Amino acid sequence: MAEEIRKILEQLLNSISGLYCILISDRDGVPIIMVQNDKAPELAMKPAFLSTFGLAIDRGSKLGLGKPKTLICSYSQYQVIQMNKLPLIVTFIASDCCNTGYILCLETQLEPILSNLTLVVTET
Amino acid sequence: MEKHIERVMDDIISSPNVFGCVFVDHQGLCLGVKGDASNESAGIIGAIADQAAKLEPQSQPPIIVMEDDTKSCIIHRNGTVTGAIYKTN
């Protein structure tokens, strides 16, 4: 199953120019599956960075607007888009000029993969 | 700003045969949507305009028309804003 998922993710990665990495991790930021190219920044793929999303959505939910679904962080050279699919976190790392809206569209395409992975994570 | 874009979209949607429109910024994020159109298509519309512009990089941004038997979608980029208009043939 892992190979199939990796293949699908690689296809998605190659379909968007400027997208460097797609990473699916658990709520602690531990990577479950990851596809990347050589431009992906190492630091943004570490659990220390990924797990801050969990804290951010906890804080964000206190704004009274419901649970955050997506977090977009725009940096000078990169943008990091994280989706709340708890118990999973989906992270996209892309260049700053990459089409953010197009990456957000991938959510529906990832849904079948995520439902499979969620089953695995909740069982373990 | 919203009022201005709302007015533009109202003008567009009141044109004959037009049933929807979407406006997208340079990052593919939805600026506004009116009628029978989805804000989820914003990113794809931006990407289509980007890819089509790469065919002739020296020229002005192209007008892209996609049509089927009954409907058509017209996409055009002007500066940082891309607009898509859906209309019946």
Named regions from a protein language model:
Chain B
Residues 1-89:
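Non-catalytic interaction/Regulatory regions outside core domains
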